[in-house]
Amino acid sequence: MGPRIVSSEVWRAERLALLAEEKPLDRARDALSEWRRALPATAVTQTYLFATETGPATLADLFGGRRQLVVYHFMYGADWAQGCPSCSFWADNFDGIGVHLAHRDTSLVAVSIAPLAKLLAYRDRMGWGFPWVSSAGTRFNQDFGVTMPEDEPVPEYNYAPRPGATGELPGISVFLLDQGRVLHSYSTYARGLDMLNGAYHFLDLTPLGRQEADLPWSMAWVRRHDQY
């Protein structure tokens, strides 16, 4: 079924009605962001050693001399042949923003549990340029809730019990470097990652939208960008 066809006067009236609803949502989003920024932080006392292109690095090293670090927990299991398709969809939105983040004293790094060689080979295949490091041999993924512990009867994901959850799951964690201390300020998972996918938000502006309602699951249509 196509859209209703109306006069420009009717279209303008309906657009203004929608705008009246959009503006409070914008203000609510701003207030939520302010609340997020005001959250307290916890000190990261565990030592993690990541494998990077330039050698072993601590979590503090991943800041790259900046005060803030955003970690994208990219799903790539140690024995996987390829990275997760949906994480790859998200990562397609990351390239090109690094220089802008740097000018706000912020670094963006992807972290996965797979060996570094696999990550870099897959990054080359995808044509990405953002930093990607391996947390293999550390508890980083488990501690930040994206690798489900095998010995836990009911694992937790997104701050709630997730019966049956196994392996790797996606997330974002945010850190602040304060007087040499690494502080954890925020993590989000599942639909909380939606705000980071620009492609979805472009689709949300269109009459057809995401076109996912009739699919077996929402992202059943998603492929790695070299597999469409």
Please give the residue ranges for each predicted region:
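Non-globular targeting/processing and membrane-anchoring segments
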Residues: 1-104, 121-127, 131, 138-228
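Catalytic nucleophile loop
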Residues: 102-119
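Short loop/edge segments at beta-strand edges and connector loops
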Residues: 112, 134-136
